[in-house]
Amino acid sequence: MVFMTIENVRQEIENIDRELVELIAKRVEFADDILKYKHQANLPINDDRQNDVVIGRAVSIATEKGLDSTMVKQIFNLLIQMNIERQHELSGEGNLP
């Protein structure tokens, strides 16, 4: 068993936090790409059915990993809302729903 000091553990958490933010940024970039497809197909920015699929998938994974699925659902709702607001901004619509 490897003994880690509290500083080591905090450093590992900091590394994970950095990775999480980088993954969020990558997710936003892909959402920007999706906006282009939505514009070409004349689709609305918000797609409740797709949002439900994304949240359902996240909740399922959270359950498999023994995580609080309610909290994971809240996190993914925030991620989706962030993407929706960004897509509105890129469309010149500000953050209107």
Model-derived regions, located:
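Domain-level signature for soluble enzymes in the chorismate/prephenate branch of the shikimate pathway
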Residues: 1-97
